[in-house]
């Protein structure tokens, strides 16, 4: 097994371990949001031997060996030997986990998520169940989970398949393929129900049960927003469908003309159709283009005609998305929120204010 690796550390403290052998394949795990990161991914296989340059870029040589128990599970489930790995040590947060790309030469076999956090293991089990349910509904272009379990030394392991190749593309603009995937979710998993019966409503209930996690002013504005949403839905039945909840370029790729979507660990069964598109648009604006809340709002204004083709009231839909994403992150991270998550929540709250003003105008 190859032991010679390159350790990559970015300015946010995120760490990747890349094998020097078949590095180009290993780098398929690395999904940078910045132009600098994308250039690094392109040229690293040819430049990593330049020691002075690597030092300036925050890289160093290390030796790395996969945990033998995890290695055994992977080889057994994928029915392969001499597999290779690249490793991402995770985004610093309450749900930090290690993600491993499994490959052999130029052939990517799948991915493995690892944690010692029992709460995260519950999320792994949810994702396995959710993927199985999506398959039963006829949703394709998603992974399968051949294994979700625990090693003897207490590591929780989640395996998933992939169709990714070296020719796969990551599209950073919301396009027809992304909308077609969301349309498929609506058609194949859509169901009529009362708002108060939906997963979407349960997320709001979870926030209300943890209202102490918000400042007084934030709590007041969230209460106003949830009242607006309650009034919008009323007592009639509405169509809800499956929701990815982290629908971003980093959780999908295109290959052979098809879009493949993964990382459904926060997936839910009953949300407003197409709501995922707001997460794609908002998060790429924040992370890739570093736009302010006002700039993101102006971009949404420019998309209003397009959004009206998918939503009866696009501004209400955007408010629903913003309230939901704030609620999920506040409840998920609790009192352990990092400064980066606090910054995100502040941006979403500012956007929520702008959207609520827009709704009053209309």
Residue ranges and their predicted role:
Residues 96-125:
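ATP-binding glycine-rich loop module of kinase domains
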Residues 328-362:
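ATP/Mg2+ or Mg2+-diphosphate-binding catalytic cores
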Residues 127-142, 163-204, 222-236, 245-250:
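Conserved kinase catalytic-core helix
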Residues 154-165:
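Conserved short submotifs of the Hanks-type protein kinase catalytic core
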Residues 1-88:
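Juxta-kinase regulatory segment immediately upstream of eukaryotic protein kinase catalytic domains
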Residues 275-309, 322-337:
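Active-site activation/catalytic loop segments of kinase-like enzymes and analogous catalytic loops
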Residues 144-154:
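Short beta-strand micro-motifs within the conserved protein kinase catalytic domain, predominantly
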Residues 97-102, 231-275:
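Active-site acidic catalytic loop and adjacent metal/ATP-binding pocket
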């Amino acid at each position: 097994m190859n032991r010679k690796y390159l350790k990559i550390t970015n300015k946010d403290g995120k760490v990747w371990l890349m094998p020097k052998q078949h590095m180009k394949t290993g780098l398929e795990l690395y999904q940078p949001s910045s132009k600098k990161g994308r250039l690094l991914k392109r040229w690293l296989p040819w430049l990593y031997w330049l020691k002075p340059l690597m030092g300036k870029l925050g890289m160093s040589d290390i030796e790395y060996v996969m945990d033998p128990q995890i290695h055994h599970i992977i080889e057994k489930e994928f029915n392969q030997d001499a597999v290779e790995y690249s490793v991402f040590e995770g985004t610093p947060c309450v749900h930090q986990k290690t993600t491993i790309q499994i490959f052999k030469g130029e052939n990517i076999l799948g991915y493995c998520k690892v944690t010692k956090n029992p709460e995260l293991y519950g999320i792994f089990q949810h994702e396995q169940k959710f993927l199985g349910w999506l398959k039963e509904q006829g949703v394709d272009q998603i992974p399968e989970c051949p294994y979700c379990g625990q090693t003897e030394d207490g590591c929780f392991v989640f395996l998933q398949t992939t169709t990714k190749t070296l020719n796969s593309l990551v599209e950073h603009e919301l396009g027809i393929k992304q909308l077609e995937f969301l349309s498929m979710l609506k058609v194949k998993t859509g169901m009529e129900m009362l708002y108060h019966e939906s997963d979407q409503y349960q997320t709001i209930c979870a926030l209300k049960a943890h209202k102490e996690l918000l400042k007084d002013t934030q709590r007041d504005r969230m209460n106003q927003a949830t009242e607006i949403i309650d009034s919008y839905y009323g007592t009639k039945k509405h169509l809800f469908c499956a929701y990815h909840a982290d629908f971003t370029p980093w959780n999908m790729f295109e290959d052979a003309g098809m879009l493949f979507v993964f990382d459904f660990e926060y997936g839910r069964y009953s949300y407003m159709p197409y709501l995922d598109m707001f997460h794609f648009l908002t998060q790429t604006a924040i992370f890739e283009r570093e736009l302010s809340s006002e700039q993101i709002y102006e971009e949404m204004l420019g998309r209003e005609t397009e959004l009206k083709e998918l939503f009866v009231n696009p501004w209400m839909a955007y408010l629903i998305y913003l309230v939901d994403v704030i609620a999920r992150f506040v409840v998920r991270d609790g009192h352990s929120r990092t400064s980066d998550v606090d910054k995100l929540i502040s941006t979403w709250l500012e956007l929520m204010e702008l959207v609520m003003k827009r709704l009053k105008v209309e």
